[in-house]
């Protein structure tokens, strides 16, 4: 070997050693302590917690994956996030769904001083799989300026949203895209009963101006005057109202008031780090952070409130859960069925659904000054068709029938049994819409003979 060749070989050996050294260092960094969180909360909520936790534990990297609650549940159930450690969200039925699937690890309650229940609802899962850290009120958000400019009344309960005066002035998110909306839909179904609850949701659906892509879009739309009323959660209202003259929040009598929770996922690759993050969220410091204006949440720990501070909303909702008796287990068992019915009945048919409801409302009003027995019978028939759920309460007596329903991504095959259920639901909805439309046409003819002119669609918002 010549001297030049020897020098070249030595250079190569040195380069290899340097690469190995730096590669090893890089690998060591990549394999350092970390915790990955799946959450439905916005960055304005989780970033302060991530920063404060890193101050306490600078050796632990905190990775956050933001997903809508429903999408997060799908990701976790289909193991698309095998490296995730924690699930952090508002909707208790989403946690119950994951618990039933065996996807949540046990986690011991922390000494927060929180009561066992708030308004009758357990703060922590009695089975020890998820822990409440904050409290959420679910209700109505409205823009006072929008309502005043149009002479619209402020809604105070869910039934107000079905009033004809609010047609075209309401926004919400589909429950299949938002755990917040799903919880509110389910709460009314449980409070009023399956068939009465769906009748009310159908009427509210007929008044919708839009269905937004995310929960945050509802409060943002109200704040910007795209529509005047929304269905939302209290902290999203506060987040959008910051620095604005605008949104107000109402807790209806049949509302839902529930803990937001955090849980460690089964098979978490970083269980120690995950438990440390839970420790922090439930620590006095973490609980006090919830009360900061930039976050604006209700803490479960009484020590987070000042001596003269009364947690807002608590006096308004005392005993609500005792009346409604919300059952997270029942909700979890029919989670996808409720989403499927809402989307097929209201989301995907919004324009036609609104048109039918506007016609019905206009003719019911006309009937007051033009009494006609046959027209009244036809309108009663139309209302019954518009408010009839495509799955009856009697069919729910066999809960196993719908338990295996799952949200299937576009382009993937739907299981045969689910395809049959979906087809039957679509067929029932289409038949009811056709029945309502036929009855409304006949009623319109009778009222027209009495001098009535249908102007219900004139200038209507789509």
Positions of PLM-derived features:
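C-terminal non-catalytic accessory extensions
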Residues: 363-462
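Extracytoplasmic ligand-binding site segments that recognize negatively charged/polar headgroups
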Residues: 47, 83-84, 90-212, 216-223
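A ligand-binding cleft/hinge motif common to bilobed small-molecule-binding domains
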Residues: 93-97, 223, 227-246
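Paired acidic/hydrophobic, glycine-rich loop segments that form the ligand-binding mouth/hinge
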Residues: 84-89, 211, 226-233, 248-250
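Early extracytoplasmic/lumenal segment of secretory-pathway proteins
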Residues: 31-96
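A bilobed periplasmic-binding-protein/Venus flytrap-type ligand-binding module shared by bacterial periplasmic
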Residues: 141-146, 257-273, 289-290
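Periplasmic-binding protein-like
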Residues: 136, 169-173, 200-205, 211, 243-270, 280-301
């Amino acid at each position: 070997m010549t001297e030049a060749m020897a020098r070249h070989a030595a250079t190569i050996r040195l380069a290899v050693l340097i690469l190995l050294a730096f590669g090893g260092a890089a690998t060591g960094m990549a394999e350092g302590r970390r915790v990955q969180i799946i959450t439905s909360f916005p960055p304005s909520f989780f970033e302060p917690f991530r920063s404060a936790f890193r101050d306490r534990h600078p050796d632990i990297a905190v990775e956050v994956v933001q997903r809508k609650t429903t999408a997060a549940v799908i990701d976790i159930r289909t193991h698309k996030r095998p490296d995730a450690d924690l699930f952090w969200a508002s909707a208790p039925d989403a946690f119950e769904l994951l618990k039933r699937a065996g996807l949540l690890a046990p986690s011991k309650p922390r000494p927060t001083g929180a009561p066992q229940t708030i308004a009758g609802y357990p703060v922590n899962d009695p089975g020890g799989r998820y822990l409440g850290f904050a409290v959420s009120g679910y209700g109505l958000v409205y823009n006072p300026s929008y309502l005043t400019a149009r002479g619209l009344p402020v809604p105070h309960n869910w039934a107000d949203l079905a009033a004809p005066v609010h047609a075209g002035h309401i926004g919400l998110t589909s429950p299949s895209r938002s755990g917040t909306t799903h919880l509110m839909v389910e709460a009314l179904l449980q409070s009023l009963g399956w068939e009465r609850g769906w009748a009310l949701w159908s009427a509210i659906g007929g008044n919708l101006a839009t269905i937004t892509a995310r929960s945050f879009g509802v409060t943002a739309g109200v704040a910007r005057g795209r529509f005047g009323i929304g269905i939302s959660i209290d902290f999203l209202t506060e987040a959008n109202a910051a620095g604005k003259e605008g949104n107000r929040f109402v807790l209806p009598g049949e509302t839902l008031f529930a803990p937001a929770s955090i849980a460690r996922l089964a098979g978490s690759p970083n269980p120690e780090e995950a438990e440390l993050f839970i420790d922090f969220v439930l620590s006095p410091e973490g609980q006090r952070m919830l009360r900061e204006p930039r976050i604006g949440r209700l803490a479960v720990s009484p020590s987070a409130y000042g001596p003269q501070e009364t947690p807002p909303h608590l006096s308004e909702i005392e005993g609500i859960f005792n009346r409604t008796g919300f059952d997270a287990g029942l909700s979890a068992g029919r989670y996808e069925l409720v989403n499927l019915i809402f989307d097929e009945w209201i989301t995907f048919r919004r324009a036609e659904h609104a048109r039918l409801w506007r016609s019905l409302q206009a003719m019911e009003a006309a009937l007051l000054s033009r009494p006609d027995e046959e027209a009244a019978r036809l309108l009663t028939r139309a209302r019954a068709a518009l408010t009839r759920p495509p799955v009856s309460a009697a069919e729910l007596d066999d809960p196993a029938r719908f338990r295996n329903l799952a949200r299937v991504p576009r382009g993937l095959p739907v299981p045969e049994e689910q395809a049959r259920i979906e087809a039957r639901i679509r067929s029932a909805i289409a038949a009811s819409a056709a029945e309502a439309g036929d009855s409304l046409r006949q009623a319109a003819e009778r009222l027209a003979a009495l001098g009535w002119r249908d102007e219900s669609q004139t200038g209507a918002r789509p």
